[in-house]
Amino acid sequence: MAQLRPKIVKLAKIIGGVTGITTKIDENAPEYYCMAGILSDDEADIAIAAGLRKERTAGYLAKKVGKTVEEIAPLLDNLVYYGIFRRSMDKALGEDVYYMQIFAPGILEMMVNQKELLETHPEVGRAFEEYTRNLAANMGAMIPDGYGLMRVIPVESALEGIEGVSDYERISHYLDKYDRFSVSPCSCRASRSSLGDGCGHLEEDMCVQMGRGAEHYIRTGRAREITREQALEIIQRAEENGLMHDMVNIEEPGESAAICNCCACACFGLRVGLMFGARDAIRSNYVAEVDEAKCVACGQCVETCPGNALKLGQKLCSTEDLTPQPDYVKLSETIHPKRSWNPDYREDHEDVMPTGTAPCKTACPAHVPVQGYLKLAAQGRYTDALELIKKENPFPAVCGRICNKRCETECTRGAVDEAVAIDEVKRFIADHDQHEATRFVPKLCNQIGRPYTEKIAVIGAGPAGMSCTYYLANKGYPVTVFDRNPVPGGMLTLGIPNFRLEKDVLTAEIDILREMGVEFRCGVEVGRDITIEQLRAQGYKGFYVAIGAQKSARLGVAGEELTGVYGGVDFLRAVNLGEQPAVGKRCAVIGGGNVAMDVCRSAVRLGADETYVLYRRSEAELPADPEEVKEAMEEGVRFRFLTAPVEILGADGKVTGIRVERMALGEPDEKGRRKPVGTGEFETIALDSVIGAIGQTVDWGTLDTSALTTTKRGTAEADALTYQTAQPDIFVGGDCYTGPKFAIDAIAAGKEAAISLHRFVHPGQTLTAGRDRRVYRALDKEHVLLETAGFDKDHRQMPGYNAAKAKTFSDARVTFTEEQVKKECARCLGCGATKVDSYLCIGCGLCTTKCKFDAIHLKKVRDWHAGSYETMPIKVAEGVVKRAGSIVKKAVRK
């Protein structure tokens, strides 16, 4: 073990400032090991001579260490390069001056921001994280209100219309005050990335330096010079990407060297409050307030809030207490500071109040903000509504026609009369994407304002693959989609008949992906035509495998090899490719799901006079959408319930009929459904064709799955949150992971995979830190008090029907009119609203930038401001006394 170096110990004590006096320094102390492997004793002597936070000339320092200016010049250059000194030109003196700041904020940031130094001395990144963590743990309880070394400064647009705003609370004050600016990587994120602990918020072009700080950063290559206008652009882009602002808080009010664009999951300054409970030290003078009359619980503010102060709740009256007071252990009121700590603050973000929120948003697998887009549609703001929907679902026109509408199933209005026709409204909104003049194409949205260069391959152009593609392309990634089929869309194109999803509707939404820069390579089977290894060699950094479950499950009865027997998915694929599968005059479809409904209705359109659906359970257990069942019955399809195939009969190699057994319902199976059992009663039905639609399996084809593990069902195994497989650069999703589900499930999974891939392709990022788990819970409708007397009594609007298209391959359903949309949106009860926890709110104002409804604003509630670092010892002493008094008062009250 290397011997402890006294000069480095002494220097560490000096730089430690207020805490350096009492801190024990040994070889394991971050303030020691960050310098011990870098500084020489001669360099340490010069730094010691400089003292803390004093501007010194080279002549002064040379005299103090007994050397000439020429002798110490290279040592000064080294100290500046390391980040121990800040160098800037003193215009009055006409020469450079040297300034030694405290460790943090100060020296450690500058050390980390010297990229070459961080690469050659990775202990610097570790020291920054450890030092700031130790400092917060030891000093957090003693920091006076508003005296955090870093402090939140609100988004300036959030201050509009507020009286009593001080100049130093406005970002524009600093941009106007200084005349030189630079931008550097975020040092906190760079530190975390060096430790493999990044949160997906990248460090490039994040921290804006001003004045002498900018001069130093520019001269030492830590940052690039920018204009005032570019600084503002970076700040605004940070806000667009969900980042708030923090500033160095150790000078007099209105003085600062930098504006940081921070995230809660990486920033060491915010950690003082979010992990160690000292929120009063870091919060601004403002708190968020929600106007519940305007709030529609869209959740945009909630997902952005760095302090987790905003949660989705309800605004319907209830027999439950909807405002339970959290049992906080406040730092200012406890003698045991650790009780107020939250070591899991990067993992435990909650989106919803314990009492729940709007059932529609909760029930949707993608958590689409239904209440929000209904309100926008009611106001005629259709483009805004489309934009809001696409934050969670990039294919609303598709889903407006084929979704299984779990939002409507759970709609609170259904307890009064009928659920709101949510899907029909969505279809009306989304049809704006069918026209170039009205469609919504999102603009590039990432932290650097230009495309990333990391190439990503998506294998499978179905709903999961295209959803992942949309969100990656929106972030600026070059994405190539490979699909072995001749056209993109997967099951949306080839597994759903045109009378339910007309292909021009899907094509319009796929064309938006092309406009976003996505390349489709159809007719290319990965594994046969090109391998993943070859794609890696071409520079692809990540892969999303979403090939679906596109193989029909076998019936498992004799006669399946006969001509005239089809698998349901194979049959639909042929129909959608323009083929005419021979069904004859009599056709039986085996199964009871939505695929079976699509198949039987397609058979009717292909000329079958008698079409049967044979289902082994009763009508009550039929899993298909009731609307589709009704439409099939109206088209003449005959349903035979409690009927199971035993053998397919044939002659000369062709189907002639099917032998079936009458079933009865027995005891419930493991899923709670009553299991069908044979009765011994048999029947023969004369047929020309049999189509099995009892399920689908994954066909991995020639794709090399040796690096993946699969389940007994043949689906891929992967992490349930991140979708990462055993092969680190391969992620999976959609039906090839879950088994057959609905398009909206695949769409939701695709977005999560995009989040994972973004993190994966950038070194040093974790897949989970700071990630929103999106755990939703619905309000308890049993406790809701609905005052129905004042309700609009309009019944649910019904879509029109074009009889001329009946039994054709065109969609006979007619989209709502604008008048119908307005009437239907008025039926929404507006169940949800955002709730603010004023104790957790740090007053950043970021929430106000996300709200399209003018429902959330900042309010000034205090007037705290710090002085210079040199005043802190006195303020700390005052704070300790004040805290002791609070603890005593609380004890007396008890």
Residue ranges and their predicted role:
Residues 80-91, 310-311, 856:
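A short, conserved structural fragment
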Residues 94-132, 878:
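Short, amphipathic alpha-helical interaction segments positioned at domain boundaries
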Residues 307-361, 374, 420-422, 426-455, ...:
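Flanking helices and flexible, charged tails adjoining ferredoxin-like Fe-S electron-transfer domains
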Residues 368-371, 377-378, 419-423, 458-526, ...:
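Beta1-alpha1 glycine-rich phosphate/pyrophosphate-binding loop at the start
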Residues 561-585, 668-740:
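FAD-site-proximal beta/loop scaffold in flavoenzymes
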Residues 599, 736-764:
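A conserved FAD-binding loop/helix module that cradles the flavin
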Residues 37, 67, 246-259, 275-304, ...:
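Ferredoxin-like iron-sulfur electron-transfer modules
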